[in-house]
Amino acid sequence: MAHQAHPFRSVLYIPGSKERALEKARGLAADAIIFDLEDAVAHDEKIHARRLLKTTLETADYGHRFRIVRVNGMDTEWGRADLEAFAEAKADAILIPKVSRAADLEAVAALVPDLPLWAMMETAQGMLNAAEIAAHPRLTGMVMGTNDLAKELGSRYRPDRLAMQAGLGLCLLAARAHGLTIVDGVYNAFRDEEGLRAECEQGRDMGFDGKTLIHPAQLEIANAVFSPSPAEIELANRQIAAFEEAERHGQGVAVVDGKIVENLHIVTARQTLAKAEAIAAFRAS
């Protein structure tokens, strides 16, 4: 897991062209917001969305929510202008769509010298080049684009996301190898709470930091699933206490609830507590 001062349990897409949605997002319980200029904006609204979002970010207060701007691709007529407009914007990262190779980030890095870059991982080629992409020195985060990936694969939806497993795993490995944040793809049936919870739990158990969301109704479940539970926090504290006691007696392992606890378990326990503390600090802010 990447060491984070900021939680990314819930990462909500907001269309950059919708003034009311941009205003409403200021009061939502999202850890991060992706202000979208790409898929969520019609072609004839692209320029309007760019101007509206730029003004909004300059004037509106989004508190401690992490602000990500998803621009249009450099292969479109809007991509370069998007990057020039937001190169010095009040944003925390620029999200690049359809990153298939590390070279896709180079032109962006030159136009946006100061902001961190995030990559949409949503092409078959991107899956195969995930390690190369994750190694780019300007990259700090990855977002799974499972809808576009499913389209490329020609796969059908299954609750277990069998067709996605290889790509999800490759990107997770790459992100963890390079200390990046990585968030899971969207769940399209936003009124299906049971299905959303199951997919959030699957992503959490795989190792994702959080989930991208398409509707505010999904926030509560994502925040709950990707937060350490009281039982997990209690176990982490007991593991640390038991291991420290064992060390004082010259032992390298402890036993908690009939299970061996080694140093690697303590690393995980401390990460659990750090995540809980980061979430508590975010709520307090």
Swiss-Prot record:
Reaction(s) catalysed by this chain, per the record, are: (S)-malyl-CoA + H2O = (S)-malate + CoA + H(+)
- Residues recorded as binding substrate, renumbered to this chain, are R70, E122
Claim: Magnesium is one of the keywords in the record: yes
Keywords of this protein's UniProt record, alphabetized?
Hydrolase, Magnesium, Metal-binding
Top-level EC class as recorded in UniProt? hydrolase
> What cofactor does this protein call for?
Mg(2+)
Keyword check for Hydrolase: yes
Q: Name one GO molecular function term.
A: hydrolase activity
Q: Which domain of life is it from?
A: Bacteria
Residues reported to bind Mg(2+): E122, D148
Q: Which GO terms describe its biological process?
A: oxaloacetate metabolic process
EC number in record: 3.1.2.30
Protein family membership:
Belongs to the HpcH/HpaI aldolase family.
Q: What does this protein do?
A: Catalyzes the hydrolysis of (3S)-malyl-CoA to (3S)-malate and free CoA. Inactive towards beta-methylmalyl-CoA and other CoA esters.
Subunit structure, interactors included: Homodimer or homotrimer.
Protein known as: (3S)-malyl-CoA thioesterase
Query: What is the species listed in this Swiss-Prot or TrEMBL entry?
Result: Cereibacter sphaeroides (strain KD131 / KCTC 12085)
